[in-house]
Amino acid sequence: MGTVPDPLRVTKASIVAASGKEESRGESQSVSPQPAQPDNNASGIGNVPAELSLQLSAAAQALMQACVSESSQQDMASPGVFSEGEPVSPKQKTPDDFLLHGSKESAAPGLNATAQKELISAPCLISVVQHTHHAIQRDAPNTSTCAVPEGSLVKSEANSNGENPEKPGCPARVTCCSSKNQEGLCDFPSPENSQGILQTPDIASPSADRPEGEGQKVINNITAVSSEPPVREGCSENKQPSATALNTTAERSENPPPSHLTSKGATCSSEARQALLPAQYPVSRFKEASTMTCQAESGAKEVSGRAWQDAEVQAVASVESRSVSTSPSILPAYLKENPAPELENGQEQLRVICHGKGSGNHLLELSNSMVDSQESRQCPSIVPQVHIQAATATPAAFKGGCKPANQPAEGLKSPLIHVTSSQNTETEEDLRLSASKEATSRQPEGTNPDFQKANAIGQISLPAGSQAEINQGLWNSGPREPEIVVKTAKDHKAESSCKPSNSGGGANKDYPPESLDPTDKKGAKDKKPASPLIVKDHAPGATSTLDAKTLLLNPKSQVKEGEGPEVSPAPSPGRKSQQNTLEELRQPKTVMSLSLPSDGTGDSSPGSGKRTPSLSVKASPRRGSRVSEFLKELSVTAAAAQVGLTPGEKKKQLGADSKLHLKQSKRVRDVVWDDQGMTWEVYGASLDPESLGVAIQNHLQRQIREHEKIVKTQSGQTRRSISSDSSSSKKLKGRQHGVLQSMLQNFRRPNCCVRPAPSSVLD
């Protein structure tokens, strides 16, 4: 095939194209002079389609004669040619091919003009496709002729374009044509090529109008031409990215071909279509693989995948929340850095939205889209159905209080979503729409919405919300909406009645913060828009469990906890069962809360977003030593969990243990490290890296200090001992020396042997 115009080699490409065009013109002109002009025009980007059709019509006639035999040979030798075509393609792949690669890659757009012309003439596919397309449109006889001319056109154009012996290339083309994907791909590189491709299915269908074998041959020829080794590889590289476009175009053209076929009344149109369709199916598969995009066909699969993602997200969220709770010292910083860790991590909080028409049907909608999560941040009222109002509400929303978006009767429709303000209502509606879309797609997969609602709400939304709350500060009792908590998937009426303001949804505005803020002693502060960190507390449905937790954790907040029960004064039996099911899900939450220090006297500074008195207290650097206490508490909780105690027993035991630990914490050393430098508490605490790192750092610092003290004391003792030893030895030596001296001095010598004074000698 002729070299594709390279932006750098436009001139050379044009020359090559001109030569290829001339050759193709010669052949086509022998048949009819028109093709040459179409080729020239085809070189023009804008004129390509029409001129291609002209060229194809003329070339088709010329090629008909040349390719009639070739097409038949191709039909017979298509398998063998198939293998041949590929070797040939490497052969033809020589400079032109590489040029084609480079030029196509660099100047894929450049193909549009000269390249497309040459590709059209050379990849007969486009030219044949367009030619067949236009020729079929123009001349029915040309269609039949096109089939053969395509083969001949492939030869002539292949010769002219490739300027390489392309007769072997023709078999290669035939072989290539066997894979229509390639032909589409080869033709696709340039936008015009894509146009040609769009027409290619049409052409294929026109060729389908011809006898099946003939049409298929033509298609094969076309594909072979287009997939001529140079074009094939060059185009394949450029076209793989555009394979999707090719698929699209092929599909589009696929639809046109029926029209052409029907208009042409081709005998083999249906068969040709079928042949084209199978060829295109692989294309679609290729598109999926290359683009990593999900086809509409896999919508159901996507739905199921989404549901799975939701469950996984919840599990991850729970792990994160536990890790945070285990390392309370890190919690304040963690909250500051990651106000909504789940949202940041892309863990989408599930909001189960029950759309009830009247108090009857309740569609369960799971919305886990990031947009929804963001909206949930803005609209705390949008709750993951049961207890959790996933995101923190805007301060204004909190101030306004959470009012059920719908009246108690309408509250049943969306008990989950209570919009604090008109803005929230808008976001709520958006969430509903998105959730409804997802729900509609998901519901087919799952069981009836009621069943999904009960299970999903109980299992998924609960963990997500509760752990989200924990992560963001369980006790940041921003205006928690007991309404949502009270709402149960089963009884929406009970939910509406149970809504924090049991008497009326409107009363909830003022009430929820106080009742749901057992931990926070200052209800008014809670009413104030808490910092975005504030996560709505445990669902009102779980208020009983929350009360128990708070009693265990914050005995001082018991008075307020009394308020909490008000949230669910008349839990419906459905909600009770849901609470029972949820208790198990909340057990990790209880463990986490228990692990947190049970100091009711938390520093709940009104401004601090993390109104977790105990958390803030323990998190304060002054109480870094409390980490060990937390670890011990965690170990107690973990041991209780392992023992398999029922939630109530576990709570009791944990509460007692935590109290004992608090009493003993002063006497107990922070952490007892074994030979390996780890303790069972650390192992069993399921600490996240941050908390574990903090504990290890504290421990190491402590050890270093102790070691330094020991070293100092030992060094002081050794110095003293050394000094004493040296002094004593010196004294002893001096004494001995003095004795000898005295003896010598006292020793009477003869006068002749009198020696100078020993002092002079010694000195």
Swiss-Prot record:
Biased amino acid composition, Polar residues: 27-44, 237-250, 437-450
Entry GO CC: synapse
Biased segments, Low complexity type: 593-609
Residues bearing the modification Phosphoserine: S323, S359
Pfam families reported in the protein's UniProt record: GRIN_C
Disulphides: none
Keywords, ordered alphabetically: Phosphoprotein
Record-linked InterPro entries: GPRIN2-like/GPRIN3, GRIN_C
GO biological process: cell morphogenesis involved in neuron differentiation; excitatory chemical synaptic transmission; locomotory behavior; neuronal action potential; response to cocaine; vitamin D receptor signaling pathway
Ranges where the record places region Disordered: 1-48, 65-111, 192-268, 420-452, 471-624, 711-737
Bias type Basic and acidic residues, positions: 93-104, 480-496, 518-539
Origin superkingdom: Eukaryota
Physiological role: May be involved in neurite outgrowth.
Protein name, as recorded: G protein-regulated inducer of neurite outgrowth 3
Originating organism: Mus musculus (Mouse)
